[in-house]
Amino acid sequence: MLYGFSGVILQGALVTLELAISSVVLAVIIGLIGAGGKLSQNRLSGLIFEGYTTLIRGVPDLVLMLLIFYGLQIALNTVTEAMGVGQIDIDPMVAGIITLGFIYGAYFTETFRGAFMAVPKGHIEAATAFGFTRGQVFRRIMFPSMMRYALPGIGNNWQVILKSTALVSLLGLEDVVKATQLAGKSTWEPFYFAIVCGVIYLVFTTVSNGVLLFLERRYSVGVKRADL
């Protein structure tokens, strides 16, 4: 059925998953920092992150990916040359995680900013009145409440990141796209293996939808009843 390429394709699929999960973790971290920066009273912080999100959303992902990848490579080689060290090539997986995380960190910034703004201020004021510290307010009030509003955006961003991992094959990463391309060229069946690649991504997104639906229900427990 896969002409002996099942092992290679499976390995490529695992690489794709690893890339997607690692990238979304980095993007979430950047997004939380960015949302905090845009909501802070510090005007400089707000301007920096506003410029970051505007730049990222205004330039195509592939162009940004190539700029970041080659920019990192040039910067690294400049530093190593100054130190008298030979050229160092950036690992495609590391490059992919950094580029995807940096790009989609901008989208997560807007997702989290909107979610934090949707949390009723009365909840925070009540927690403060009960003597909660700022850390406790964030962990026990703001974060759980924010997640209910953020999950649809998180799910959408995750799906986009998952599909955008296909672009990283251009950087030399041996992911599922690269594996199916290799299989297609070797067997003279490129269309068939393109379908195989599409089916694998469809399975990933379908399973992701189920997980996200579960999380949305989990964070909405008691909310609908209270709204009624």
Swiss-Prot record:
A Pfam family this chain is assigned to: BPD_transp_1
Domain ABC transmembrane type-1: 13-212
One Gene Ontology biological process: amino acid import across plasma membrane
InterPro entries the record matches: AA_ABC_transptr_permease_3TM, ABC_transp_permease_HisMQ, MetI-like, MetI-like_sf
Cytoplasmic membrane side: 34-58, 109-148, 216-228
Locations listed in the record: Cell inner membrane
Predominant location: membrane
Transmembrane segments: 13-33, 59-79, 88-108, 149-171, 195-215
Gene Ontology CC terms: ATP-binding cassette (ABC) transporter complex, substrate-binding subunit-containing; membrane; plasma membrane
ATP-binding found in the keyword field: no
Record's keyword annotation contains Manganese: no
Keyword terms, alphabetized: Amino-acid transport, Cell inner membrane, Cell membrane, Membrane, Transmembrane, Transmembrane helix, Transport
Periplasmic domain ranges by topology: 1-12, 80-87, 172-194
Gene3D superfamilies: MetI-like
Membrane topology: Multi-pass membrane protein
Molecular-function GO term, any one: high-affinity L-histidine transmembrane transporter activity
Similarity comment: family membership: Belongs to the binding-protein-dependent transport system permease family. HisMQ subfamily.
Oligomer status and interactors: The HisPMQJ complex is composed of two ATP-binding proteins (HisP), two transmembrane proteins (HisM and HisQ) and a solute-binding protein (HisJ). The HisPMQ-ArgT complex is composed of two ATP-binding proteins (HisP), two transmembrane proteins (HisM and HisQ) and a solute-binding protein (ArgT).
Function: Part of the ABC transporter complex HisPMQJ involved in histidine transport. Is also part of the ABC transporter complex HisPMQ-ArgT involved in lysine/arginine/ornithine transport. Probably responsible for the translocation of the substrate across the membrane.
Protein name: Histidine/lysine/arginine/ornithine transport system permease protein HisQ
Gene symbol of the encoding locus: hisQ
